[in-house]
Swiss-Prot record:
UniProt: NADP(+) binding residues: G187, A188, G189, E190, T191, I192
Annotated binding of substrate, by residue: T49, C50, N51, R52, S107, E112, P113, Q114, Q118
The enzyme's E.C. designation: 1.2.1.70
Active-site annotation: C50
Keywords: NADP, Oxidoreductase, Porphyrin biosynthesis
Protein name in the entry: Glutamyl-tRNA reductase
Reactions catalysed, as given in the entry: (S)-4-amino-5-oxopentanoate + tRNA(Glu) + NADP(+) = L-glutamyl-tRNA(Glu) + NADPH + H(+)
Pfam families, alphabetized: GlutR_dimer (PF00745), GlutR_N (PF05201), Shikimate_DH (PF01488)
GO biological process: protoporphyrinogen IX biosynthetic process from glutamate
Gene behind the chain: hemA
Domain notes: Possesses an unusual extended V-shaped dimeric structure with each monomer consisting of three distinct domains arranged along a curved 'spinal' alpha-helix. The N-terminal catalytic domain specifically recognizes the glutamate moiety of the substrate. The second domain is the NADPH-binding domain, and the third C-terminal domain is responsible for dimerization.
Pathway: Porphyrin-containing compound metabolism; protoporphyrin-IX biosynthesis; 5-aminolevulinate from L-glutamyl-tRNA(Glu): step 1/2
SUPFAM superfamilies for the chain: Glutamyl tRNA-reductase catalytic, N-terminal domain, Glutamyl tRNA-reductase dimerization domain, NAD(P)-binding Rossmann-fold domains
Amino acid sequence: MAFLALGINHKTASVDVRERVAFTPEQLVEALQQLCRLTDSREAAILSTCNRSELYIEQEHLSADVVLRWLADYHHLDLDDLRASAYVHEDDAAVRHMMRVASGLDSLVLGEPQILGQMKSAYAVAREAGTVGPLLGRLFQATFNSAKQVRTDTAIGENPVSVAFAAVSLAKQIFSDLQRSQALLIGAGETITLVARHLHDLGVKRIVVANRTLERASILAEQFGAHAVLLADIPAELVRSDIVISSTASQLPILGKGAVESALKLRKHKPIFMVDIAVPRDIEPEVGELDDVYLYSVDDLHEVVAENLKSRQGAAQAAEEMVSAGADDFMVRLRELAAVDVLKAYRQQGERLRDEELLKAQRLLANGSSAEDVLVQLARGLTNKLLHAPSVQLKKLTAEGRLDALAMAQELFALGEGASDSSSDKKLQ
């Protein structure tokens, strides 16, 4: 049993690197199965968001370099380049890292709640792929419980702050009166839903949701009195949009420089504020070169986020202590589980010996032996048989110089200090 958490995030890698290491939802099942097959991993899960791509693995013998090499090969990356941005956590540290991530303690926005849902999705996909077994499954459940405790017992989640909130905060800085602004949201996932909620609460004049499928866009639009359109309608909507915020799972850019340039001409160069939260990016970086365009990537949100963190810093220490306690408790319980099979086999052996001696006793009673004699023989026979194998093994180990076995036997059988010394003294006298 050995746990491994390996990956990159917003603190170790730029958006250029992160978008090259990201997994699309369509890739995950096949990638997980390949990961287990090619790296000798017994269980695995992949968490891939705009801010991080992480692999959670259970192996008999840890081989982080093999896993890192697989990740580089899968995404056609130079191994040394990937290694420069990657981090590796093993066993206790891996457990603690997973719990910190799920609790929002390792997020770009401290305490942001979306990461827990993303972690649950990673677990669900791994179950679908058949790459989660009993050990990683227990770890995920313990991780979810730890994150829930942090949310319930600390103020880490108060004063809602998220990447979505940061994007809207930037929009407020550029457009003093959002009630006169029109917004185009590209995508219909969790982040865009949060953006739509924030914009709606601020009274934005008109919100349009563009998505690959009109059905998904319509479901989201109905919640906030918005309009739903297809991705093909984006060029027309750009002309009317003061704010554009995009977050899809597309592997290719959705908005190019030419389309935005055309929209600006029709807008008579009225400014457009754009935030690209997606990884890989939805908006070509060259769009930012245009006059009258304010383009921000997810990495540009750091300053806004820093301001919003202040209210949560006080709760962070208490949350860290809860996570550490949760990780320690999980590892203790997991190590206890390692003894279950041995204890089960030992109990079965004891019950077999008991049944053998009991059968002998019953035969003696049937043949007329006194109950007292039978009980004495039963007790003696059971004692001798139960002690035979441990006695033989203990003598063998000490004869081989394994004196640590004596201390282990004293602890295992609760014999108390000096038991072995007193018996040795008697034999020497």
